[in-house]
Amino acid sequence: MNILTAKTTEQVRAKNVRFTGNVLHVLLSDRREISLQFNEVPWLKWLAKATPKQRANWSLEPGGFAIYWPDLDDGMEVCHLLDTQPIA
């Protein structure tokens, strides 16, 4: 008889977002921080084209699993920031 046991894993969430120049910094719930030069990442061109005011107006989606910029009507999921493959 096979018995399956549930494996509980905690999904990493975004806790805070900040910008320094052309770098996006995302603080994660496990205390790591991801930093990306958004002007050099092809799938973040929409963020590179935004004004500093538009970039500053962000919100965390419920649970912190995504970041959304209402002025840009765009966002990203934390799992994509952690993935080595870029979003198409």
For each predicted feature, which ranges?
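Motif-centric detector for short Cys/His coordination patterns
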Residues: 1-88
